[in-house]
């Protein structure tokens, strides 16, 4: 469960960061 969650976060967080900071 945790590795899956970590993988999901690793895939999801950069997209949020990209939207917030507008640095992609």
Swiss-Prot record:
Per the UniProt entry, what is one GO biological process?
A: killing of cells of another organism
What residue intervals traverse the membrane? none
Q: What tissues has this protein been observed in?
A: Expressed by the skin glands.
Keyword entries, A-Z? Amphibian defense peptide, Antibiotic, Antimicrobial, Cytolysis, Disulfide bond, Hemolysis, Secreted
Give all cystine bridges in this chain: 18-24
Q: What does this protein do?
A: Shows antibacterial activity against representative Gram-negative and Gram-positive bacterial species, and hemolytic activity.
Q: Family assignment?
A: Belongs to the frog skin active peptide (FSAP) family. Brevinin subfamily.
This protein is called: Brevinin-1E
